[in-house]
Design a protein with these regions (language model features):
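Active-site-proximal alpha/beta segments of enzymes that process anionic O-linked groups
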Residues: 1-45, 50-224, 293, 324-355
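Short, P/G- and charge-enriched loop/turn segments at secondary-structure junctions
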Residues: 30-33, 279-287, 316-317
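Metal-dependent active-site segment of extracytoplasmic phospho-/sulfohydrolases and closely related
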Residues: 44, 240-281, 329-333
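Histidine-centered active-site microenvironments of extracellular/periplasmic hydrolases
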Residues: 60-64, 260, 265-308, 343-345, ...
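A short beta-strand-to-alpha-helix junction
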Residues: 109-116, 231-244, 286-292, 305-332, ...
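C-terminal luminal/periplasmic domains and tails of membrane-associated envelope-modifying transferases
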Residues: 121-126, 167-172, 184-191, 253, ...
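Short beta-strand segments
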Residues: 131-133, 195-202, 238-241, 261-266, ...
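C-terminal cap/loop subdomain of S1 sulfatases and analogous C-terminal strand-loop tails that border
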Residues: 270-275, 337-371
Length: 371
């Protein structure tokens, strides 16, 4: 399986660690923040990994890979956005944009840490920020995770062995190991406003390592691949998607009795022989739409909906709008009523002022390539 060398972005554009933190501190000090009047007590951002929404039954896939979220959707609990693409093909590239005001169109000479970030802004808005991760804090892909985690009030990584040291993805625990940690924080954290980043290992290859045996629901016989090897890999990926559905649902379940809103996206997608003899994710120049078509889901608790019916109506009414994940910070802020000097309402997909952007992929409009 071939994967993009997007870790080169992390190495070349990471910056000296001391310089990074000094710059982030300066930006945070300059940022003007208004916490607003909604005062949502619980805000959760789940960042998944390598999940192509075209392999989710929630989005119409032929195998029942997302029964838990489908059940919630059938009950009207979810807003399922069906035209959202990732801002990049690889984790490091996406991480350099999703948590800050940087975008795909940014000046390439301006490093990621020179843009105001969501964690610092939410903390200035009075949120106690918790970072829970099943990804690596050090290594080819882990550096962004570490930097953003350290901007939080507290952070916890399930494993710390970096990919460069032979650990990383291979050393990852099952994502459900994050659930007891989340339970502990919810039990012990007495802060009135809490923000959680939950970074999953998701459906990252090696797929068969992403789920326990009890979630081995699909076999090669269920798959359309041209060879036994392809079918086996596809079935393992679909099992990983199935398990990921369970984990996301379990996270949501923990906020059902609270005034809470949960956002879920995957960092990027995955091509499994969908467009040719290729499995993995590549550079954009060699990429396919499967590598960027990601799930974007919003769940809100009954309490949130009762207190913010107008906002929930806007969220539900925006599910068919074209969007890209490097602007998600603005949507999150809009949903919880936080504004700042870096917030731009036109980038919130749920806003009446949303300005649809041109989504360029591999030098051409994404819509034209997909039609």
């Amino acid at each position: 399986m071939r994967v993009t060398n997007d870790f080169l972005l992390g190495v070349a554009n990471m910056g000296n660690e001391e310089t990074v933190y000094v710059t982030l501190d300066e930006l945070a000090a300059k940022e003007s923040v208004d916490a607003g009047t909604r005062q949502i007590p619980y805000v959760v951002f789940i960042l998944g990994e390598s999940t192509d929404r075209n392999h989710m039954s929630l989005y119409g896939y032929h195998l029942d890979t997302s029964p838990y979220l489908k059940s919630r959707h059938a009950k009207g609990e979810l807003a399922v956005f069906d035209d959202t693409i990732s801002c990049g093909n690889g984790t490091a590239n996406v991480m350099s944009m999703v948590f800050n005001t940087s975008t795909k169109e940014r000046d390439e000479n301006v490093c990621w840490y020179k843009y105001p970030n969501m964690i610092d802004i939410l903390r200035k808005a009075g949120y106690y920020a918790v970072w829970l991760s099943n990804q690596e804090p050090v290594g080819r892909w882990g550096n962004f995770d570490r930097y953003y985690a350290k901007r939080s009030d507290t952070c916890h990584f399930l494993h710390i062995s970096g990919s460069a040291a032979g650990g990383g993805v291979a050393a990852a625990e099952y994502d459900e190991k994050l659930l007891p940690l989340l339970d502990d924080y919810l039990k012990l954290n007495q802060q009135p406003k809490q923000y959680y980043t939950i970074h999953l290992e998701g459906t990252h290859e090696n797929f068969r390592r992403r789920y326990p045996k009890s979630f081995a629901k699909f076999t090669a016989e269920d798959e359309p691949g041209e060879s036994d090897e392809q079918k086996k890999m596809q079935s393992e990926y679909d099992n990983a998607v199935y398990y990921n559905d369970y984990v996301v649902d379990e996270i949501i379940r923990r906020f059902e009795d609270k005034n809470a809103i949960v956002f879920y996206i995957s960092d990027h997608g995955m091509d499994l022989y969908d467009t040719g003899d290729f499995a993995g994710h590549s550079s954009e120049e060699k990429g396919s739409y499967h590598m960027i078509e990601v799930p974007f889901i919003v769940w809100a608790s009954p309490s949130y909906k009762e207190q913010n019916p107008d906002v929930w109506a806007r969220i539900k009414g925006a599910v068919h709008r074209p969007y890209r994940t490097d602007y998600i910070m603005h949507t999150i802020f809009d949903a919880i009523g936080v504004t700042s000097s870096s917030y731009e309402v036109k980038y919130s997909v749920i806003s009446d002022e949303y300005a649809q952007l041109k989504r360029i992929y591999n030098g051409a409009l994404y819509e034209k390539q997909r039609s």
